[in-house]
């Protein structure tokens, strides 16, 4: 009989969001008339920007002609999209990033997991707690951890707790680590990092030969122009960081699928014999072997994000969701709850009421208010007694959800 990958057997009972789905399904089966409002999974709800839709329609029509047909595209992405990304997202903010260092993909979740393909199994990994579960689970699947302990933490990982007590800013590790996952604006807490905080991480990484895996999927939601949107705004980051970005949340591409990863040329790791190896070449080889590229039609839609009309429409989308976040913050505060986040991110991080843990609060809101959120403990042990609500929904649903919660 064929053997399975035993690392998958280390995974806890279920990925957070499928477990939420299971509980919601059971509730809906027992209460078929309940009008659920879902503020849990961070999926967007508003239509794709018109500029993106029109660009994709034009691309579809072109595909119907001999002259405009496109088959397999470059695994790294079409040059015109990579140029637009480099110019608008990085060079415009003073970052020394070229188009050749941009790798277009179908999702930052995929990239933040697949990057492990080019990194050695012996690397010591650090993650914040709470943390986006994919960072942890992908390392478990790749064999970089031991078993999970009683509170769900895996042996072999270095956990960096973040909470209200430390301003949701993880302390620099006291011991050397090799891989550091950072996400700002943060999922799930909604916290942001200052230039000084990111500079400290870059300094640590350079001093210890570590690699920062920087998830900037929510950078478009930052409201303060003085806050950094990219790790590459920080001096020295080209020597120690890879950045993941996505069109999912700013432009509504969750169902359309387009993202990108930035791997600077000159960024190096070491081989088993100690020889320095450029990570750009390894990632390029990995993508060329395991990835067929994002469709031409979708990439034309992503390119339109950088048009004048696209920029205006994306800005309006982001503003809409941030207004939702402001409503959630205001109404929950008025209801007597302690809330964080929601100012530079589409997530509001809530302290659960006294005597109620994360899943208890989940069940309370589900059963009493018919509102679905995300238990903080699902993001890690330090997320216990916290709860995440997402601003990704219609205004009517957000208003109704807040009215229901305030009525409890």
Curated annotation (Swiss-Prot):
EC category name: transferase
Organism of provenance: Synechococcus sp. (strain CC9605)
UniProt lineage: Bacteria, Bacillati, Cyanobacteriota, Cyanophyceae, Synechococcales
Subunit structure: Homodimer.
UniProt xrefs under InterPro entries: Aminotransferase_I/II_large, DapL/ALD1, PyrdxlP-dep_Trfase, PyrdxlP-dep_Trfase_major, PyrdxlP-dep_Trfase_small
Cofactor(s), names only, from the UniProt record: pyridoxal 5'-phosphate
UniProt pathway annotation: Amino-acid biosynthesis; L-lysine biosynthesis via DAP pathway; LL-2,6-diaminopimelate from (S)-tetrahydrodipicolinate (aminotransferase route): step 1/1
Recorded family membership: Belongs to the class-I pyridoxal-phosphate-dependent aminotransferase family. LL-diaminopimelate aminotransferase subfamily.
This protein's name: LL-diaminopimelate aminotransferase
């Amino acid at each position: 009989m064929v053997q399975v990958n035993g690392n998958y057997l280390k995974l806890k009972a279920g990925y957070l969001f499928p477990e939420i789905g299971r509980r919601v399904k059971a509730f809906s089966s027992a209460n078929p008339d309940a009008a659920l409002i879902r503020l849990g999974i961070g999926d967007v709800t508003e239509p794709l920007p018109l500029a993106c839709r029109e660009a994709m329609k034009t691309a579809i029509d072109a595909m119907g002609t001999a002259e405009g047909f496109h088959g397999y595209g470059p695994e790294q992405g079409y040059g015109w999209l990579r140029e637009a990304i480099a110019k608008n997202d990085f060079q415009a903010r003073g970052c020394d990033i070229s188009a050749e260092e941009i790798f277009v993909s179908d999702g930052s979740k995929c990239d933040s997991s697949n990057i492990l393909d080019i990194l050695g199994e012996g690397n010591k990994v650090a993650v914040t707690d709470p943390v986006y579960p994919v960072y942890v689970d992908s390392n478990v699947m790749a064999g970089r951890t031991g078993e999970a302990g009683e509170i769900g933490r895996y042996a072999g990982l270095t956990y960096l707790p973040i909470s209200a007590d430390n301003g949701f800013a993880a302390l620099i590790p006291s011991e050397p680590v090799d891989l550091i996952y950072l996400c700002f604006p943060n999922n799930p807490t909604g916290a942001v990092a200052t230039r000084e905080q990111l500079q400290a991480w870059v300094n640590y990484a350079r001093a210890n030969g570590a690699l920062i895996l920087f998830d900037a999927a929510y950078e478009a939601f930052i409201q303060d122009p003085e806050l950094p949107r990219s790790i590459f705004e920080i001096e020295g980051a080209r020597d120690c960081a890879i950045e993941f970005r996505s069109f999912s949340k700013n432009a509504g591409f969750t169902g359309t699928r387009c993202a990108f990863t930035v791997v600077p040329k000159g960024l190096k790791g070491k081989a088993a014999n100690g020889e320095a190896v450029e990570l750009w070449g390894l990632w390029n080889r990995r993508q060329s072997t395991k990835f067929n590229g994002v469709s031409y039609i979708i990439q034309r839609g992503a390119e339109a994000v950088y048009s004048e009309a696209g920029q205006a429409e994306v800005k309006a989308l982001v503003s809409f969701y941030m207004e939702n976040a402001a409503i959630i913050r205001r109404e929950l505060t008025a209801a007597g709850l302690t809330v964080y986040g929601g100012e530079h991110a589409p997530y509001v991080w809530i302290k659960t009421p006294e005597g109620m843990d994360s899943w208890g609060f989940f069940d309370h809101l589900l059963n009493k208010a018919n509102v679905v959120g995300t238990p903080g403990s699902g993001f890690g042990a330090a997320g216990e007694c916290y709860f995440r609500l997402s601003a990704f929904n219609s205004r009517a649903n957000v208003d109704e959800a807040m009215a229901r919660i305030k009525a409890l």
